[in-house]
Amino acid sequence: MSKFQHDVMLRIVKILNVLMIELPFAACWFLYYSHQTYANLAWEGHFAILGLFFILYIALGKIYDAFWMSMQRVSELVYGQILGAMATDGILYTVICLMSAKFCNLLPGIAAIVGQLVMAAIWASCAHKWYYKTFPPQKTAVVYDVRHGMEKLINEYGLSQKYDVQVTLSVSECLADLSILDGMETVFVSGVHSHERNIILKHCVGKGINMFVIPRVGDVIMSGAWPMHMFHLPMLRVGRYMASPEFLFVKRTMDIVISLVALVILSPVLLITAIAVKSDGGPAFYKQVRLTKDGKQFEILKFRSMRVDAEKDGVVRLSTGDKDDRITKVGHIIRACRLDELPQLLNILKGDLSVVGPRPERPEIAAQYCEEMPEFALRLQAKAGLTGYAQVYGKYNTTPYDKLQMDLMYIAHPSLIEDLKIMLATVKILFMPESTEGVSEGQTTAMSGENH
């Protein structure tokens, strides 16, 4: 099967998903909500409503990985589709209320969500089986300089059905005989220096082999380079993070609006949580010095989730998740729901934090990391954030170096659209246990200072 045929088949299956998810909404619209509007809509109006759902669901579904059947488990596909569907339903419900000049009954909408859940489960199960039956595992090679455990990761994430690792070899073995890669469909390259990697890259491109590279920090920085001409030569301009004044103004305006609206809407939750945390006789809030842009220090505000004497000896200890006996009963609950982070909305309003950015680190932990890897200081090019690229796409126990690269990927490509994607994608990880896993004894992470 050619790549073109492969892509066409995938698009047809994905469009089928969109139509299946839209079907319950369409039934809900025609049977109930269309009769609530103050104007009788012609067929063009109905088409516009259904078309809006179609477009919004595709956009939101991509953010939540709702269509990525080759890289997601069935449960993850269903989860992503329901998040995308609920977000789309919410937007359309708002539009319908505006068209009706009143708050409409939510029950038909809830019924539509139940129908969408059923449709998502049917599609995800069938599409997952269809994909792996139609497309056999790709012949895969792993080339390494420093082992990255790529084979283990492929198996751990359930991707052995997609990538059949047939060859694992060192970069020296690969360069000695590049023909070893011939016949492979995919090559993963891990920890290989740029000069050697470029030789492998040229060979793979020439042979039509897909190549995945686990980058180094320099690669991530280069990814944000600005292509240009100078002296009749192609050049790449690389420099320190320098967002435009217009971008920073809009980003700050968004921070203020989002934090204000969130504080108003969530005020009952904040009050109840504060009372619950104080029930053990300790303070409701916990303050800790953190670093933000250009190394500026500020006090981050969180709901206290550990005992008051959690660090009475002055030693910073890693949180080991649910097994950490320093976490209070209320602390376990608010951590699981991320409620302990909500007071940081005040830090955002004050200007210490942004909604999206690298997570702020403790000065002593940052100093330790900078000794081990000086590039860690590059995170301070941008203002710290409540959520970020590393939080959405990494895990609590992702290594500091990997989180650093994720943060630098965000910094290299400043974009309000990317900020919006990260905000929406943050919703997806709120109820995913692996994103709050603790760390094992002796393991350090870029978040290891966040004990409270």
Where are these regions (language model features)?
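C-terminal terminal-structure detector
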Residues: 375-452
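Short, glycine-rich, amphipathic interfacial segments at transmembrane boundaries or analogous
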Residues: 218-219, 286-326, 386-405
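A hydrophobic, helix-centered structural microdomain
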Residues: 247-310, 347, 416, 422-452
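Loop-to-transmembrane-helix entry motif
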Residues: 81-85, 89, 253-261, 337
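Signature of alpha-helical transmembrane segments in polytopic membrane proteins
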Residues: 1-132, 452
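A short, structured surface patch at a secondary-structure boundary
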Residues: 320-383, 422-430
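N-terminal hydrophobic signal-anchor/signal peptide
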Residues: 1-24, 125-264, 437-452
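Membrane-cytosol interface motif
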Residues: 81-85, 137-152, 283-306
